[in-house]
Swiss-Prot record:
The family this protein is said to belong to: Belongs to the DNA glycosylase MPG family.
Organism: Psychrobacter cryohalolentis (strain ATCC BAA-1226 / DSM 17306 / VKM B-2378 / K5)
Keyword terms: DNA damage, DNA repair, Hydrolase
GO MF annotation list: alkylbase DNA N-glycosylase activity; DNA binding
Protein name: Putative 3-methyladenine DNA glycosylase
């Protein structure tokens, strides 16, 4: 089938209500879409194919914000049924994009760690950015959750919104199914044994990864 014949479908919020580890693995190869308005008032859609995710699996996961039932105003959205966004700020600088997953009252989510732009999106994004030093011409420009949200202009205004086109951020499926490998999660040395759990899902050997 020619690339022009590939048909994408919008992933429905109910898709995210499945087990979190399944969602995290199945997101590899999916397309994260971001609708933006340029300086001329024109709408554009940036598309990033997801190459790396991490699963956070609830109160028994010491790396999860809701570990041991830590239910706070910030983490409340994690108790929602899968299909909404959980975005938070880390180190006072970087926004982290999480897709809430699993059943209601089970605080779980998938962190989007890395991806790469497709279908002319690099050109569209560079038109959006006036500073040539910020232009996204390299395969690793979205390699890392902070770089990713900065590049796609995602912040906490997305918190709690449904994962649908109405929120201007959504996921599409065009049938891409790459080989997926499992690795330990990154940056969670505080999490005891949980830091060794194989809950980071990567597109095997893809150059866009934040870490192989």
């Amino acid at each position: 089938m020619l690339a022009s014949q590939v048909v994408s479908s919008v992933v429905k919020p109910s898709w995210f209500a499945r087990p979190t580890c399944v969602v995290a693995a199945d997101l590899i190869g999916k397309v994260l879409c971001r609708e933006l308005t340029d300086s001329d008032g024109q709408q554009k859609i940036l598309r990033m194919r997801i190459s790396e995710t991490e699963a956070y699996i609830g109160e028994g996961d010491a790396a999860c914000h809701a570990h041991a039932g830590t239910r706070t105003p910030r983490t409340e959205i994690m108790y929602h049924i899968g299909g909404v966004f959980y975005v938070y700020l880390t180190y006072g600088i970087h926004h982290m994009l999480n897709l809430v997953s699993g059943p209601t009252e089970s605080p779980e989510a998938v962190l989007i760690r890395a991806g790469f732009l497709i279908e002319g999106s690099a050109r569209l994004m560079n038109e959006q950015l006036l500073d040539v030093n910020r232009q996204l011409n390299h395969i690793k420009q979205l390699a890392g959750p902070g770089k990713l949200t900065k590049g796609l202009q995602i912040d906490r205004t997305l918190y709690g919104k449904p994962i649908t086109p109405a929120s201007k951020v959504w996921v599409e499926d065009d049938g891409c199914q790459p080989l997926v490998s499992l690795r330990p999660r990154i940056g969670i040395d505080y999490a005891g044994d949980a830091k060794e759990w194989l809950l980071r899902y990567i597109w095997t050997d893809h150059p866009s990864l934040s870490k192989k």
